[in-house]
């Protein structure tokens, strides 16, 4: 036997399998979800925003007049999806058909004051919503979050407004949205929030006591060894059984 060495995972970024139960992942730096740089031009309308999670939800807008636009270099060097504050919104297919727990994170900013409605919705669902920063004033990038242990629906998600109301239109830029089908543990929540804050320039909005206020979190994406119960040589992790 040789010297035992520590294994350090090469990939420490958030991925679709990093935190269990990720059911919707929208990223404005990868609108088509293919993992490569987007070829969209500044100001082009966004008819669909591809879900990067394993669930592969459909998030789109079929009506040309209600589509947000793609904006380059609005979160520093990163692109964003801009909603006009009048009637832009996107709709998702049902993430889950039964009630249960959830955890949602949404990154947004408003560069110009007076755009959209006060109390505008970043995300609207029956029974709950995620609201943009209070009022219609400008605000720097920040991570909005919301969660529940149970009783929440994820069947009729709208991004950017509530279509049943004319006073909830969001005017500003969205960078990233993550929805999990359970309430995350505190450590998980802080890691996801820290990742988003550092990625989108929102660390200034984190409280001073946040564990990732100064340094971005590192995720462990290394392969996990799982014994197969009942399989000869594998029900106990041994040298011969691996």
Predicted regions and their residues:
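GGW-centered surface loops in extracellular recognition modules
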Residues: 8-60, 105-107, 176, 184-242
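Short Gly/Ser/Thr-biased coil->beta-strand turn/linker motifs
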Residues: 23-24, 79-81, 119-121, 157, ...
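Extracellular glycan-recognition modules
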Residues: 44-139, 167, 182-191
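Extracellular glycan-interaction patches encoded by glycine-rich segments
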Residues: 151-175, 183-184
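Extracellular fibronectin type III
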Residues: 1-6
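Extracellular/periplasmic catalytic domains that process cell-envelope and extracellular macromolecules
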Residues: 15-20, 71-76, 97-100, 151-152, ...
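Carbohydrate-binding surfaces in secreted/extracellular proteins
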Residues: 136-148
